[in-house]
């Protein structure tokens, strides 16, 4: 999760987020080199006497500043396209979760189980326990197993919402009448927090998401207990 005064990204919890962090560093390095070159050229022009002010043709220079930007764009585009392909690729998911956005809460349905679904509401500030996070805690966590590919089917019952988990590198719009899908694969257990990331009304900021990733054994015990109490 995020911390006060944090400047960087949250710790990666999924292979996709790890790839996004590498891509961010890769792109930032290219931008830094370009910025350094531009600043060097500007400082040189300001501190030295201009020469060749009457040059009408410079074929070599024009060739360089046409080809070099194209190469730079390719170096940025190739890893970006690779990550986009990875985010859209869903191969043999072990579990399918249907997520529906409402004003202003989330509902989850475990499609592989006969009758396992629930709503997830934010816990009001006055009901929080010591150590719980304001505007981020919910009454029912979305519990999923770690190290397994999970397909998320995301839609909305009313207006536009967006189901976002920064540590997973995941942000998928929930659109009425349309079913979007995403993949979750967690590399470690824990609690991971997100929020609705599309303005959806007066209580938009009160739609937190809490994902609880647990080992498969604990997940099976949890599903059994949930189905026995429903």
UniProtKB/Swiss-Prot annotation:
It comes from Ornithorhynchus anatinus. Residues 1-14, 88-230 are mitochondrial intermembrane. It catalyses: 4 Fe(II)-[cytochrome c] + O2 + 8 H(+)(in) = 4 Fe(III)-[cytochrome c] + 2 H2O + 4 H(+)(out). Pfam families: COX2, COX2_TM. This is Cytochrome c oxidase subunit 2. GO terms for cellular component: mitochondrial inner membrane; respiratory chain complex IV. Cu cation A2 binds at residues 196, 198, 200, 204. The chain crosses the membrane at residues 15-45, 60-87. Residues 46-59 are mitochondrial matrix. PANTHER family: CYTOCHROME C OXIDASE SUBUNIT 2 (PTHR22888:SF9), CYTOCHROME C OXIDASE, SUBUNIT II (PTHR22888). Its cofactor is Cu cation. It is found in: Mitochondrion inner membrane. Belongs to the cytochrome c oxidase subunit 2 family. The modification Phosphotyrosine is found at residue 218. One of its GO terms (biological process) is ATP synthesis coupled electron transport. GO terms for molecular function: copper ion binding; cytochrome-c oxidase activity. Its EC number is 7.1.1.9. It is a multi-pass membrane protein. Binds a dinuclear copper A center per subunit. Component of the cytochrome c oxidase, the last enzyme in the mitochondrial electron transport chain which drives oxidative phosphorylation. The respiratory chain contains 3 multisubunit complexes succinate dehydrogenase (complex II, CII), ubiquinol-cytochrome c oxidoreductase (cytochrome b-c1 complex, complex III, CIII) and cytochrome c oxidase (complex IV, CIV), that cooperate to transfer electrons derived from NADH and succinate to molecular oxygen, creating an electrochemical gradient over the inner membrane that drives transmembrane transport and the ATP synthase.
């Amino acid at each position: 999760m995020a911390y006060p005064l944090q400047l960087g990204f949250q710790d990666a919890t999924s292979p996709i987020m790890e790839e996004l962090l590498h891509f961010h560093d890769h792109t930032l390095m290219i931008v830094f080199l370009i910025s350094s070159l531009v600043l060097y050229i500007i400082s040189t022009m300001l501190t030295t006497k201009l020469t060749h002010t009457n040059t009408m043709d410079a074929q070599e220079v024009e060739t360089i500043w046409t080809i070099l930007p194209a190469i730079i764009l390719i170096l940025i585009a190739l890893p970006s396209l690779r990550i986009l392909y990875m985010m859209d690729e869903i191969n043999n998911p072990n579990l399918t979760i249907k997520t529906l956005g409402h004003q202003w809460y989330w509902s989850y349905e475990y499609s592989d189980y006969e009758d396992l679904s629930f709503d997830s509401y934010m816990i009001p500030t006055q009901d929080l326990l010591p150590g719980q996070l304001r505007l981020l805690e919910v009454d029912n966590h979305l519990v999923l197993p770690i190290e397994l590919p999970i397909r998320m089917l995301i839609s909305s019952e009313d207006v536009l919402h967006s189901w976002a988990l920064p540590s997973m590198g995941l942000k998928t719009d929930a659109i009425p009448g349309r079913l979007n899908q995403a993949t979750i694969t967690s590399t470690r257990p824990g609690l991971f927090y997100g929020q609705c990331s599309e303005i959806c009304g007066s209580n938009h900021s009160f739609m937190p998401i809490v994902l609880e990733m647990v080992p498969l054994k604990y997940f099976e015990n949890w599903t059994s207990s949930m189905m026995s109490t429903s």
